[in-house]
Amino acid sequence: MDPGCAYSTNLAATVVESVKAGKSKAETFAALDSSKWAHLQEPKLLDDAVQIPVAGAPSIGPPNAKITIVEFSDFQCPYCAIAIGEINALLRAYPTQIKLIFKQFPLETHPQADLAAAAAIAAHKQGKFWPMHDAMFAHRNDLSRKSIMLLAKQNGLNMDRFEADIDSTEVRETVVRDVQDGEHAHVEGTPTLFIGGQRYNGQVTLASLKPIIDGELAGAQTGTRNKAGN
């Protein structure tokens, strides 16, 4: 159980409430399909659009994309790892219409996530963010300093520069700013997505995200989409 991951937090709350109410195992499982869990699964955008600073953050997709998705993520979060394939499928489905921006949000419950976040930013300074992103998620159960250095070497980073950058004040402050940006946007767990500046509520799957994207694209054409300037 990971208290910082968005989905597990909601699941745990449902289970705890069922146990407190003295419900049986069968009733508890049934509760997971009830209103609260169904609400979590219902894909929609919440709240008004917010401004999230993204200058200098790693991104993928065309700079003039109609839709910007900002992802707050943690390299040791199991749900973030699962979401990678779904987000990649979304980017393939909309190759000219979506830009994805990655923001660090290492959770306190993940002891190696903060170092991994610094490593990702250090790799970004050498134009190697996405290779390190993929490598660290693939090895998320061991993101010790030794493991991260090995992954960096395998991905062709300049190791002298990487080792200096990972411990630099500049990189550490970037991690802190990303976390603060997430907190200001009311990020409570990972992964958390903002689509056009609005917080996304729902499963991070292609099936759940596609209707949201289609709706945003339709809104962009008619000028009714809620804009945040991200």
Where on the chain are the PLM-derived regions?
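Short N-proximal segments of mature Sec-exported proteins
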Residues: M1-T14
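Short, charged, surface-exposed loops that flank catalytic or proteolytic processing sites
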Residues: E17-T28
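C-terminal cap of thioredoxin/glutaredoxin-like
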Residues: S18, A38, T68-S73, Y79-L91, ...
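Loop/turn elements at helix/coil->beta-strand transitions in domains of secreted/extracellular proteins
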Residues: K25, A65-T68, P95-K99, Q126-P131, ...
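All-alpha RGS (Regulator of G-protein Signaling) helical domain and cognate RGS-like helical scaffolds
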Residues: W37-V54
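A short beta-strand-turn-helix
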Residues: Q51-I67, R92
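Conserved helix-turn-beta segment immediately C-terminal to the redox Cys motif
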Residues: I84-F105
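Short, internal strand/loop/helix patches
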Residues: A120-D142, L151, G156-E163, E170
